[in-house]
Amino acid sequence: MARIAGVNIPDNKHAAISLTYIFGIGRTRAQEICAATGIAPTAKVQDLSAEEVDTLRNEVGKYTVEGDLRRDTTLNIKRLMDLGCYRGLRHRRGLPLRGQRTKTNARTRKGPRKPIRK
């Protein structure tokens, strides 16, 4: 297994699909990385040479991925909550942020139903 950005990517899959195992890299960005490095997206990772894996590693290093990206998103949410803006309050209460109705839906965001206490 090749290790890129702290993630063991699977050997038996295509290079473009294997790159999507890294948090912050989806199908489109994986295709762009393969095009930039000159590696065929359909090439299996186990068939790549060590130099090709190094070029992939260097190209992925240009993007914000994995721990840095997770930290950035949590800090952005924390900043909204500290500001006390509408989106921050919705994050704090665990409700939808983008104007969805909450009277009947939003069960995923609100969690399981709580019984009515008398």
Curated annotation (Swiss-Prot):
Gene name for this UniProt entry: rpsM
GO annotation, cellular component aspect: cytosol; small ribosomal subunit
InterPro entries cross-referenced by the UniProt entry: Rbsml_uS13_C, Ribosomal_uS13, Ribosomal_uS13-like_H2TH, Ribosomal_uS13_bac-type, Ribosomal_uS13_CS
The protein, known as: Small ribosomal subunit protein uS13
Database matches in PROSITE patterns: RIBOSOMAL_S13_1, RIBOSOMAL_S13_2
Any one biological process term the GO annotation gives: translation
The species this protein was found in: Chromohalobacter salexigens (strain ATCC BAA-138 / DSM 3043 / CIP 106854 / NCIMB 13768 / 1H11)
Residue ranges, annotated region (Disordered): 94-118
Its biological purpose: Located at the top of the head of the 30S subunit, it contacts several helices of the 16S rRNA. In the 70S ribosome it contacts the 23S rRNA (bridge B1a) and protein L5 of the 50S subunit (bridge B1b), connecting the 2 subunits; these bridges are implicated in subunit movement. Contacts the tRNAs in the A and P-sites.
Subunit structure: Part of the 30S ribosomal subunit. Forms a loose heterodimer with protein S19. Forms two bridges to the 50S subunit in the 70S ribosome.
Gene3D superfamilies tied to this protein: 1.10.8.50, 30s ribosomal protein s13, domain 2
